[in-house]
C-alpha cells in the first residue's frame, strides 16, 4: 500500500504544475525504499551501504550519547530542583559506578529520570528536524535538486551540542543558520566546508552568549534551579566558596585567572583535601617557616579555612603566598579540577556524571560510538587518534614547559597549566567533538596524511584555546571549525607530498 501511494505521488509530480515538488517525493521514496538509480558512468560499485544507510549508521553510533543526554538531563534536573540538600550532597559525593546505581535505585528510580530527560531532549530534537528539514525542503524545491540524507545526522548532532535550558526559538534559529548559511549557500550536502551542526552552535554561542554559558546546564527552567540552589545553600549555611552551584569543569578553569599559581592550589589541597606530598611543598614549607615567626602555633597542613585563607593571601615578604584576597575562591574551586576531587573525579568525568551540554558529558558513551564508527569504516580512526594525541601532548607540554621555565616544580606558574594531560581528554566536549564532529567526511581532509595533520592541529588548538584564551571556556568548537577552514589546504599539501613520493 505504501509503495502504491508513493507511485501515485510520482505520477502526480509528472504534471507540470507539481514538478517542483519532485524532491519531496524523491526524499520520501528514498527514505522508505532502496534507491533504484543505475549509475551511468564509472566507478560502478556494488555495495549494500548507500548514503542513507551510511547516515543511519552514524545515527546508531550516537545512540549511547543520546541515551546519556536523556538520562543525565533528567537525573540532574530532579536533583538540582529538589531543594533537598541531603539529596544533593549524596549526588555530588558519588564516587563510583556501584554507588551511582545505588543512589538512583534508592533515591529517585528510573522512570521519573527518563521521563524528565525526555521532556527536555525530545522538544529540542523535534525542533532540529522540523526546522532543519523545512530549510532543506525549501532549497530543494527552489533549486530543483534532491533532498539529501545529511539532515539525519545533523538533526541529532545539533541538539546534543546545546545546553538543556536553551530557549526553543534560539534552537530553531541555530539549526536554520547551520543548514542555510553553512551548507545550502555552499551548494548543499557534500559542498559545505564547515560542519553544519557545529556552525549552528557557534552562531548561538556568539549571538546569545548568556544563553550558552553560565548557569544554563541543568533542567529546562534556569529560574527554578537557581531558586532551589539558593534554598539548599541557605538551609545548610553554605557560602560561595563551598556552596552548591552549576559550575562545570571548564567554567571553573576559565574563571581562574593566571595570577592563581600552582603553589596556591597545592597549599589548599594539602590543608583542605588532606593530599600528602604536593609537588610544591618545599616552597610552601619555606614560606610557612617565615610565616610562623609572626604566627606561632600555626601548623601547616592542619589550618582552618580562615587561617589558610589568611596565609595564602598574605604578602610573600611576610611569609604568605601572595594571592589576591578576591581570588581565593577561584583557587579553592580549581583545586577540585586539578586534583580530580569530588564531583570532578576522573570516574565522574569518564562515565558522564557531570553537567554540561546534553551530549558531551560521557566519554564512555562517545567511546562506544567511536568503536562502532571505526568497525563499520564510517569514521577515520586516524583523525580520532591524531586529535587525542595532539590534545594530550599539548596539555603535557604546558605543564612541562611551566616547570622547566619557572622552576621550583612550577610553583609560581599559573595553576591552570597543571591539569593532568589525560584529564583534558575527559573535559567538556573533547570526546564528543573527537568522535562525531572532527570526523565529518565532508569538512575534513580525505588524504591519510591530511587526516593526521588535521586531527593533531585540532587537538593542539583545543588545549591552547582552553588554557590561553580567557574569553572561551571551551576550545573544541572553535578548533574544529578552524580545522574545517584549513582542511582543503591540508589536503592540497598532502596530495603534493603523495605525488612527489610516487615520482
Curated annotation (Swiss-Prot):
Its EC number is 7.2.1.1. The modification FMN phosphoryl threonine is found at residue 248. The keyword Transferase does not apply. InterPro entries: NqrB, NqrB/RnfD. It is a multi-pass membrane protein. Keywords: Cell inner membrane, Cell membrane, Flavoprotein, FMN, Ion transport, Membrane, NAD, Phosphoprotein, Sodium, Sodium transport, Translocase, Transmembrane, Transmembrane helix, Transport, Ubiquinone. Pfam families: NQR2_RnfD_RnfE. It is found in: Cell inner membrane. It catalyses: a ubiquinone + n Na(+)(in) + NADH + H(+) = a ubiquinol + n Na(+)(out) + NAD(+). Its cofactor is FMN. One of its GO terms (cellular component) is plasma membrane. One of its GO terms (molecular function) is FMN binding. The keyword Membrane applies. Coiled coil: none annotated. The chain crosses the membrane at residues 55-75, 94-114, 120-140, 161-181, 186-206, 361-381, 386-406, 417-437, 452-472, 475-495. One of its GO terms (biological process) is sodium ion transport. NQR complex catalyzes the reduction of ubiquinone-1 to ubiquinol by two successive reactions, coupled with the transport of Na(+) ions from the cytoplasm to the periplasm. NqrA to NqrE are probably involved in the second step, the conversion of ubisemiquinone to ubiquinol. HAMAP family: NqrB (MF_00426). Belongs to the NqrB/RnfD family. Composed of six subunits; NqrA, NqrB, NqrC, NqrD, NqrE and NqrF. This is Na(+)-translocating NADH-quinone reductase subunit B.
